[in-house]
């Protein structure tokens, strides 16, 4: 069976940490693919942007 695990963080290092923890427990032969995305949105009434780093790990269960 194919399954997915979705990760979503505001900081790329947090996403990296979470994914590495998950991948440590996953047998390499079960990994199918990893999809990665970054979204940036302006913060209300400020010049800063809010970032959303996300990834989806596709694997065999």
Predicted features along the sequence, with ranges:
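Short proline/glycine-enriched turn/loop segments at secondary-structure junctions
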Residues: 42-48
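C-terminal edge-of-domain segments
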Residues: 49-61
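A short, charged, amphipathic alpha-helix used as a generic interaction element across diverse proteins
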Residues: 15-23, 27
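A short acidic, often aromatic-flanked loop/helix-cap motif at beta-alpha or helix-coil junctions
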Residues: 12-15, 39-41
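Residue-level signal for short amphipathic helical patches enriched in basic/charged
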Residues: 10, 26-29
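Short, mixed-charge low-complexity intrinsically disordered segments
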Residues: 28-36, 40
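Short amphipathic
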Residues: 1-10
